[in-house]
């Protein structure tokens, strides 16, 4: 678990109350009970190297030992989990933009924009039990809205 006092843990849910969970090294959206697993507790820490007005955050899983990152692929930007400790990102141990998401509120939900690719947002898949993705979007949609439930 992340030992920094400002770390907050959340269960992040998608529009229809499906939660984020991990399986086979991927961050998926689905019903953890039906899929026989547990919702992932996501550790969130701020990226102090970017303007606070945009609410830059890191998303860590497995106690903060792995982080969600944006990578360039032939098809465009994509998401992957990397073995990078969230505390090291917070302390500024390396270039961290690709691990950073700008958190903006949309009513009671939040949208997460990739700092490395402006205009690209974390989105839920069209089908359950599929990985979270990035999508280019100008207007908010249900697929890019996530709900944060604090977890202890």
UniProtKB/Swiss-Prot annotation:
One of its GO terms (molecular function) is interleukin-1 receptor binding. Keywords: Cytokine, Cytoplasm, Secreted. It is found in: Cytoplasm; Secreted. InterPro entries: IL-1_fam (IPR000975), IL-1RA/IL-36 (IPR003297), IL1/FGF (IPR008996). SUPFAM superfamilies: Cytokine. GO terms for biological process: cellular response to lipopolysaccharide; cytokine-mediated signaling pathway; immune response; inflammatory response. Expressed in fetal skin, spleen and tonsil. Expressed mostly in the basal epithelia of skin and in proliferating B-cells of the tonsil. One of its GO terms (cellular component) is extracellular space. Its main location: cytoplasm. Belongs to the IL-1 family. Cytokine with immunomodulatory activity. Alone, does not induce cytokine production, but reduces IL22 and IL17A production by T-cells in response to heat-killed Candida albicans. Reduces IL36G-induced production of IL8 by peripheral blood mononuclear cells. Increases IL6 production by dendritic cells stimulated by bacterial lipopolysaccharides (LPS). Ligand for IL-36R/IL1RL2. Interacts with cargo receptor TMED10; the interaction mediates the translocation from the cytoplasm into the ERGIC (endoplasmic reticulum-Golgi intermediate compartment) and thereby secretion. This is Interleukin-1 family member 10. It comes from Homo sapiens (Human). The gene is IL1F10.
